[in-house]
């Protein structure tokens, strides 16, 4: 099963880029991973920004992918529950999981309706930059849980 992690906007901070590189490398030991960036929209009303950013994200998601949005209002899963979800997808021959992290104003309703699942990493708010690293770490953690490896205590 292939994984795709998509987000809006360039990664600004060097330490975030290092974290992305570290965890993307770890994830790739378990599954093919593609990372994609959609250009962020500037200088428009929030609704217009959401719509344009989601149009760009949508072009990066193959129709055969199972789309999972990261949103603070999504389902909260424990790490073992997240691992079980990934494992079920893999075991039922889902060809690809595509995770999308929205821009500053979130997702347009139309893109949200396309999603197969919406999850939250926490009830707390994170920067969109930070979520990139946290999501990749949780995907890596999920694979170590699936493999019964000692990373997750």
UniProtKB/Swiss-Prot annotation:
What role is this protein assigned?
Specifically methylates the pseudouridine at position 1915 (m3Psi1915) in 23S rRNA.
* Entry annotated with the keyword DNA-binding: no
Query: What Pfam families does the entry give?
Result: SPOUT_MTase
Which Gene3D superfamilies does the entry mention? 3.40.1280.10
Q: What is this protein called?
A: Ribosomal RNA large subunit methyltransferase H
So which domain of life are we looking at? Bacteria
Which cellular components does GO assign to this protein?
A: cytoplasm
Q: Report quaternary structure and partners.
A: Homodimer.
Give the main EC class. Answer: transferase
Database matches in InterPro entries: Alpha/beta_knot_MTases, RlmH-like, tRNA_m1G_MTases_N
Reaction(s) catalyzed by this protein? pseudouridine(1915) in 23S rRNA + S-adenosyl-L-methionine = N(3)-methylpseudouridine(1915) in 23S rRNA + S-adenosyl-L-homocysteine + H(+)
Q: What is its EC number?
A: 2.1.1.177
- Which SUPFAM superfamilies does this one have? alpha/beta knot
Q: What is its main location?
A: cytoplasm
Q: Which GO terms describe its molecular function?
A: rRNA (pseudouridine-N3-)-methyltransferase activity
**What family is it from?**
Belongs to the RNA methyltransferase RlmH family.
Compartment annotation: Cytoplasm
Keyword tags = Cytoplasm, Methyltransferase, rRNA processing, S-adenosyl-L-methionine, Transferase
Q: Where does S-adenosyl-L-methionine bind?
A: 70, 102, 121-126
């Amino acid at each position: 099963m292939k994984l795709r992690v998509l987000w809006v906007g360039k990664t600004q901070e060097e330490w975030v880029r290092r974290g992305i590189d570290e965890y993307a490398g770890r994830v790739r030991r378990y599954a093919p991973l593609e990372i994609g960036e959609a250009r962020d929209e500037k200088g428009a009303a929030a609704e217009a920004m959401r719509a344009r950013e989601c149009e760009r994200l949508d072009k990066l998601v193959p129709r055969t992918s199972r789309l999972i949005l990261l949103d603070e209002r999504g389902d909260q899963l424990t790490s073992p529950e997240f691992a079980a979800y990934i494992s079920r997808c893999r075991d039922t021959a889902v060809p690809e999981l595509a995770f999308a992290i929205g821009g500053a104003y979130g997702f347009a309703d139309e893109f949200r309706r396309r999603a197969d699942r919406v999850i939250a990493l926490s009830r707390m708010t994170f920067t969109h930059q930070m979520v990139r690293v946290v999501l990749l770490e949780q995907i890596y953690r999920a694979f170590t849980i699936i493999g019964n490896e000692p990373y997750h205590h």
